[in-house]
Amino acid sequence: MFHGIPATPGVGALPCSVAAPGNKPELYEEVKLYKNAREREKYDNMAELFAVVKTMQALEKAYIKDCVTPNEYTAACSRLLVQYKAAFRQVQGSEISSIDEFCRKFRLDCPLAMERIKEDRPITIKDDKGNLNRCIADVVSLFITVMDKLRLEIRAMDEIQPDLRELMETMHRMSHLPPDFEGRQTVSQWLQTLSGMSASDELDDSQVRQMLFDLESAYNAFNRFLHS
């Protein structure tokens, strides 16, 4: 009597031990990159640096394709360069000594961004300080620098006033800015406040909060002007 051929699993069939993951609850466990808060911060910092470099690469490509205006590009690139410096300081150490090493380690292929980082200026910037794009880059950088200092609780008069004065002088060099530009008025008012303080005097919590709000508003107004 013909008993037939023993049944065999179909093509692509998996053994029971593989096809039934329910038998292995460990497969559903979350895999964490870190074991403690310090390690988590380390990976967060590396992720921030990675994101900044990728964003800068995308911005460079957008500018090459004429998708952003020179003024918009200059402001955005200047902001990213400031953010890059802050992000890299958080990562730099025994494991990562340079941005080149960081890119090799994480296979980050962003040649346009690397060129911007090494030149430390947007491609629109020339060497002369009277150049419009140089002024735009300096204004963006100084706005961010002062706001970062305040967020880091650096609030002494002699630590804030020099950058704020330079910001004011740079805006004055921009003939394109209208005389009644609100950002210029905001910075001027705070310079007057600081001029009435001694070098060691510090802004109180209320003043820091208000100054941050005012500078953020002025910075946003400057960006709106660039897009107009």
UniProtKB/Swiss-Prot annotation:
Residues 131-227 form the VPS28 C-terminal domain. It holds the Pfam family VPS28. Residues 20-127 form the VPS28 N-terminal domain. The modification N-acetylmethionine is found at residue 1. SUPFAM superfamilies: Endosomal sorting complex assembly domain, VPS28 C-terminal domain-like. Keywords: Acetylation, Cell membrane, Cytoplasm, Endosome, Membrane, Protein transport, Transport. One of its GO terms (biological process) is positive regulation of protein catabolic process. It is found in: Cytoplasm; Endosome; Cell membrane. One of its GO terms (molecular function) is ubiquitin binding. InterPro entries: ESCRT_assembly_dom, Vps28, VPS28_C, VPS28_C_sf, VPS28_N, VPS28_N_sf. Its main location: cytoplasm. It comes from the Eukaryota. GO terms for cellular component: cytoplasm; cytosol; early endosome; endosome; endosome membrane; ESCRT I complex; plasma membrane. Component of the endosomal sorting complex required for transport-I (ESCRT-I) complex, a regulator of vesicular trafficking process. The ESCRT-I complex participates in the sorting of membrane proteins into vesicles that bud into late endosomal compartments called multivesicular bodies, and is also involved in the budding of many viruses. Belongs to the VPS28 family. Component of the ESCRT-I complex (endosomal sorting complex required for transport I) which consists of TSG101, VPS28, a VPS37 protein (VPS37A to -D) and MVB12A or MVB12B in a 1:1:1:1 stoichiometry. Interacts with TSG101, VPS37B, VPS37C, MVB12A and MVB12B. Component of an ESCRT-I complex (endosomal sorting complex required for transport I) which consists of TSG101, VPS28, VPS37A and UBAP1 in a 1:1:1:1 stoichiometry. Interacts with VPS36; the interaction mediates the association with the ESCRT-II complex. Interacts with SNF8 and VPS25. Interacts with CEP55. This is Vacuolar protein sorting-associated protein 28 homolog. The gene is Vps28.
